[in-house]
């Protein structure tokens, strides 16, 4: 398949630069194939969830992963922590006029000292000094890493708004943005209706913003992210399916975790590890029946994923509708509900 199959023109003013004034007040485009497109608000989501359906949320928490400082040699440096390996070691993307060499000392804001001890591909391995853990150092001295299409610095409001209300486990560089729309009150309404909630963890990496640089998407190398699907979630999904109910993925990261856990056998299994699953049109879905997701970038792997799930013809019509009606796009933008189309293709 050619990358041009996943391109579209997006007016720049539709890229949301800030969250909505009130969490949960975003618009919701319901784009199920068995009904006309419906323009709703996100608080209407329970209207489309049946008692007994299971909604699976990604409980990852965004780290304040960006650090600014300088090398011992004096040059300025910026580090974006991609993955914490242990209490004092992390892998990071580095921006600097010259790449640091093994053994070079680095000093970041707050007096944080680190040594570059090696490389893993394009990532630099940093060993942090002192008694605090990497997570503690980041929480006290780091900066929230907003996506590259948000053209402003992070502020205090982002510390809460670029985080889901159910975030638990630090490790993400980017938020699972479909979850940003959910409030405690909406979660209560879903449970009152009889919906079941379950959780997975997938620590979203900076690779989620990585552009596809090849013409043939089959040649694209997908980034890897750590995930976990607990046995309780497997049981909740299996019970819902046995009742004839649907499994909802809240966000593409929840979908990638669930489908990764079922990739080997076709059946959902508990476990943890790294996944580089690349879902494109023609993929056979094993777990997810419904997807809540934001609107994605042109030519992105996430646009390919939703095209695989609902069919690219349907997705093109949905995106045309969204642009005509000026929905807000990307991380702080509006959301949509999609259903699985087994015949999904281009």
From Swiss-Prot:
Pfam hit, one: Queuosine_synth
GO MF entries: S-adenosylmethionine:tRNA ribosyltransferase-isomerase activity
Organism: Neisseria gonorrhoeae (strain ATCC 700825 / FA 1090)
Any one Gene Ontology cellular component term annotated for this protein: cytoplasm
Pathway involvement of the protein, from the record: tRNA modification; tRNA-queuosine biosynthesis
Subunit structure of this chain's protein: Monomer.
First-tier enzyme category under EC: transferase
Catalyzed reaction equations: 7-aminomethyl-7-carbaguanosine(34) in tRNA + S-adenosyl-L-methionine = epoxyqueuosine(34) in tRNA + adenine + L-methionine + 2 H(+)
EC annotation from Swiss-Prot or TrEMBL: 2.4.99.17
Primary role: Transfers and isomerizes the ribose moiety from AdoMet to the 7-aminomethyl group of 7-deazaguanine (preQ1-tRNA) to give epoxyqueuosine (oQ-tRNA).
Alphabetized HAMAP family for the sequence: QueA
Disulfide bond residue pairs: none
Family: Belongs to the QueA family.
Record keywords, A-Z: Cytoplasm, Queuosine biosynthesis, S-adenosyl-L-methionine, Transferase
BP GO annotations: queuosine biosynthetic process; tRNA wobble guanine modification
PANTHER family, A to Z: S-ADENOSYLMETHIONINE:TRNA RIBOSYLTRANSFERASE-ISOMERASE
Name listed for the protein in its UniProt record: S-adenosylmethionine:tRNA ribosyltransferase-isomerase
Compartments it resides in: Cytoplasm
Keyword Cytoplasm: yes
């Amino acid at each position: 398949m050619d990358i041009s199959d996943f391109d579209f023109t997006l007016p720049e003013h539709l890229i949301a630069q800030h969250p909505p004034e009130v969490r949960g007040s975003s618009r919701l485009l319901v784009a199920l194939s068995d009904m006309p497109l419906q323009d709703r608000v996100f608080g209407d989501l329970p209207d489309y969830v049946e008692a007994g359906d299971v909604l699976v949320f990604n409980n990852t928490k965004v780290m304040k992963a960006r650090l600014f400082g300088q090398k011992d040699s004096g040059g300025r440096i910026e580090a974006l922590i991609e993955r914490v390996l242990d209490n004092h070691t992390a892998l990071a993307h580095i921006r600097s006029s010259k790449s640091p060499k093994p053994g070079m000392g680095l000093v970041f804001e707050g007096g944080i000292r680190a040594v570059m001890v090696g490389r893993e591909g394009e990532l630099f391995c940093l060993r942090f000094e002192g008694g605090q853990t990497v997570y503690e150092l980041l929480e006290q001295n780091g900066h929230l890493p907003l996506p590259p299409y948000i053209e402003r610095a992070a502020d205090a409001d982002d510390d809460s708004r670029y985080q889901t209300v159910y975030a638990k486990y630090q490790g993400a560089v980017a938020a699972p943005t479909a979850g940003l729309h959910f409030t405690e009150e909406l979660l209560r309404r879903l449970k009152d209706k009889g919906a079941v909630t379950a959780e997975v963890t997938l620590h979203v990496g900076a690779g989620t913003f990585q552009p596809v640089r090849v013409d043939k998407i089959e040649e694209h190398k997908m980034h890897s992210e750590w995930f976990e699907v607990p046995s309780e979630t497997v049981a909740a999904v299996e019970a819902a399916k046995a009742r004839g109910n649907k499994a909802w993925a809240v966000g593409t990261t929840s979908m990638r975790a669930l489908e990764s856990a079922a990739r080997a056998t076709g059946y959902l299994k508990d476990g943890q590890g790294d996944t580089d699953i690349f879902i494109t049109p023609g993929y056979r879905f094993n777990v997810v029946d419904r997807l809540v997701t934001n609107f994605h970038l042109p030519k992105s792997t996430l646009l390919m994923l939703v095209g695989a799930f609902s069919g690219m013809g349907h997705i093109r019509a949905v995106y045309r509708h969204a642009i005509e009606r000026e929905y807000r796009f990307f991380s702080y933008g509006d959301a949509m509900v999609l259903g699985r189309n087994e015949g999904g293709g281009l």
